Amino acid sequence: MADDLDFETGDAGASATFPMQCSALRKNGFVVLKGRPCKIVEMSTSKTGKHGHAKVHLVGIDIFTGKKYEDICPSTHNMDVPNIKRNDFQLIGIQDGYLSLLQDSGEVREDLRLPEGDLGKEIEQKYDCGEEILITVLSAMTEEAAVAIKAMAK
């Protein structure tokens, strides 16, 4: 019975987001804006008006696409904050635009797409030169993407 439970993944059925009061959010923190996980790049608060609450104006950049999103909410309301995980995997191959990554468990993942743009070119270039590199993978709200690379410690 206990053999079919998987505790390795670490989320244990946890929600992809958790609530946080608007006034507790901070710049460089994370928040869900328009259904997308974003990093807060700008935040301003307006004073309490004649009717209602103080408002918080949030500007965030999507952590996967880089698109800019804005939202305004009362400071007392709750906003969703994405659960974000960063993992480093060793790059062992690139095939058909997908990365082959070695996990800590020894298993190989081949479901992550090579990022587009400069990062993708840099990964290919270092791989072609035979450098051993680690790929930093960011995962939030059922999405995953390679966001950074670093040389492996010898």
UniProtKB/Swiss-Prot annotation:
Membrane topology term: Peripheral membrane protein
Pfam families in the cross-refs: eIF-5a, IF5A-like_N
Effect of residue 47 to D: Causes total inactivation of eIF5A in supporting yeast growth
Gene3D superfamilies, per database record: 2.30.30.30, Nucleic acid-binding proteins
Region span, Interaction with DOHH: 20-90
Disorder named in the UniProt entry: Faundes-Banka syndrome: An autosomal dominant disorder characterized by variable combinations of developmental delay, microcephaly, micrognathia and dysmorphic features.
Alphabetical GO biological process terms: cellular response to virus; positive regulation of intrinsic apoptotic signaling pathway by p53 class mediator; positive regulation of transcription by RNA polymerase II; positive regulation of translational elongation; positive regulation of translational termination; translational elongation; tumor necrosis factor-mediated signaling pathway
Function per UniProt: Translation factor that promotes translation elongation and termination, particularly upon ribosome stalling at specific amino acid sequence contexts. Binds between the exit (E) and peptidyl (P) site of the ribosome and promotes rescue of stalled ribosome: specifically required for efficient translation of polyproline-containing peptides as well as other motifs that stall the ribosome. Acts as a ribosome quality control (RQC) cofactor by joining the RQC complex to facilitate peptidyl transfer during CAT tailing step. (Microbial infection) Cellular cofactor of human T-cell leukemia virus type I (HTLV-1) Rex protein and of human immunodeficiency virus type 1 (HIV-1) Rev protein, essential for mRNA export of retroviral transcripts.
Record note on modification: Acetylated by PCAF/KAT2B, regulating its subcellular localization. Deacetylated by SIRT2.
Free-text tissue specificity from the UniProt record: Expressed in umbilical vein endothelial cells and several cancer cell lines (at protein level).
Effect caused by changing residue 47 to A/R: Abolishes acetylation
PROSITE patterns reported in the protein's UniProt record: IF5A_HYPUSINE
Residue positions where N-acetylalanine is found in the record: 2
Name of this chain's protein: Eukaryotic translation initiation factor 5A-1
Family stated for the protein in its record: Belongs to the eIF-5A family.
Organism: Homo sapiens
GO cellular component: annulate lamellae; cytoplasm; cytosol; endoplasmic reticulum membrane; membrane; nuclear pore; nucleus; synapse
Keyword Transport attached: no
Disulfide bond residue pairs: none
Biotech and industrial use: Mature eIF5A-1 may be used as an in situ diagnostic marker for aberrant proliferation in intraepithelial neoplasia of the vulva.
UniProt keyword terms in alphabetical order: Acetylation, Cytoplasm, Disease variant, Elongation factor, Endoplasmic reticulum, Hypusine, Membrane, Nucleus, Protein biosynthesis, RNA-binding
GO molecular function, one term: ribosome binding
Lineage of producing organism: Eukaryota, Metazoa, Chordata, Craniata, Vertebrata
Family annotation (CDD domains): S1_eIF5A
Mutagenesis or variant effect for residue 49 to A: Causes total inactivation of eIF5A in supporting yeast growth
Keyword Nucleus part of the UniProt annotation: yes
Subcellular location: Cytoplasm; Nucleus; Endoplasmic reticulum membrane
